[in-house]
Amino acid sequence: MRIHVTSRTSVSFLVGALLIGLVGGVVAQPQPDAKTYAANPALLIDAYRHVEVASVSDALEQLYNKRSFMTHRIHAISDGKIAGFAVTVQMDKAEGSAPSAVTPMQAAIDTAPKDSVYVMVVQDGDDIAGIGGLMATAMNARGFSGAVIDGGVRDVAYLKKIAFPVYASGIVPSTSVGHYRATQAVPVTAGGVRVSPGDIVVADADGVVAVPKDIAAEVLVKAQALDQTEHSMYGYIEKLRSLEEAVQRFGRL
């Protein structure tokens, strides 16, 4: 390839570009498309870790007119970003049941792959601890991204000590053993949102969102675009000191 340079400025620009590419090793790469993400689950989850949960929620609403966010009751108990594939457990009341009745909630942990998110629904469970320190330790050791419990949790000081992200409806010292029966790998309704095994679950300080697995790649690409637009607006707003002008220019609020 022959390059025609017409000025000293052009030479400087060309040398600078070459230095960035060859010496710095920084070359802009095109962002993967939905098809690429759909074919690579690890890439998909890694990308979901870097988008804001609010943008994921907006993407689902704009693309499918679908509510995907869990009620504000489900909030961070042990802070941290969550992004992974749902492993689901339903806990139903079974007063006086044998301890073995909750064995499936343990099996769900021990058979789950890395980057899973433990999603448990405890029937009338605001005053029942669905998980505690032992279960969180096992999840953490197996590489879970975090846990989302429609119910209570306990051993909170330890959850924070090991920095394992947990979102739940509250904190309570009780146990489910002897009071509940567990079923694993079934669709559940957590915080008002239907979650099936393998769906994408993301959570941050803004809340929790579940994305159906068959549309997860498309939703991700839309969320990335929304993130990019919003982040571009911050400096524009600060410079012009006008929200209205920024909204007119970027078309996002």
Language-model features, listed with the residues they occupy:
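Bacterial N-terminal signal peptides that target proteins for export
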Residues: 2-15
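Bacterial N-terminal signal peptides
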Residues: 12-24
